[in-house]
A protein has these predicted regions:
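Accessory nucleic acid-recognition modules appended to NTPase machines
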Residues: 2-177, 181-182
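Short catalytic-loop micro-motif centered on adjacent basic/acidic residues
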Residues: 185
Length: 185
């Protein structure tokens, strides 16, 4: 930070991600946890209704990896947001574990994951990101920030989808949180 060199910061974040991935091997030695984590930016940028496990791990299904997702959530490296089929004050009553979204618990690491295909993320990328000049939709970065902040305040996170009149597309409420005797979108 004192050098204003984001590349040095990026390398430190890559080292942290490597440690996470090493720990994911302890959770699941098949590599599924690592694959799920690495796919978070791609999953969110698709703007899909849920985390599509089969796109992150070929021929895998939610039912077979749910224990891995729970372990990742318990490790506090990810924030998992579950679909609430009927959002009332008892959101957990209609929690649908087959439909979830996954966010990183650290948005800085999320940004590095998004550019992980390069050996290092150049200062110019961080400069453009900080000055809102990056030519990409950053909505998913902001979504990750909100998930991180809400979880840091102790909120349990849910989301809800509502079909359009035609039923083929959905409106989505990204975060539905219980707030005493009511819910807040």
């Amino acid at each position: 930070i004192t050098t204003n060199n984001f590349m040095a910061v990026d390398q430190a974040k890559r080292d942290i991600i490597a440690l996470y991935e090493e720990d994911f091997g302890k959770i699941d030695d098949s590599g599924r946890a690592k694959a799920l984590y690495d796919a978070i930016p791609a999953q969110l940028s698709r703007n899909a209704m849920r985390y599509q496990v089969g796109k992150a791990i070929e021929e895998e299904r939610v039912s077979r990896i749910m224990n891995v997702v729970k372990e990742m959530e318990d490790s506090m490296t990810v924030n998992v947001v579950y679909h609430s089929d009927d959002p009332n004050t008892g959101l957990a009553l209609t929690k649908n574990e087959d439909y979830f979204k996954m966010y990183t618990s650290d948005t800085g690491l999320f940004v590095t994951l998004a550019f992980k295909d390069n050996k290092i993320t150049e200062n110019i990328i961080y400069d453009k990101l900080l000055n809102d000049k990056l030519s990409t939709n950053l909505g998913y970065v902001y979504e990750n920030v909100i998930a991180q902040v809400l979880r840091a305040t102790g909120k349990n996170l849910f989301y809800h989808t509502i079909p359009y009149a035609e039923g083929k597309k959905y409106y989505e409420i990204d975060f539905v949180i219980p707030d005493r005797h009511k819910i807040s979108p």
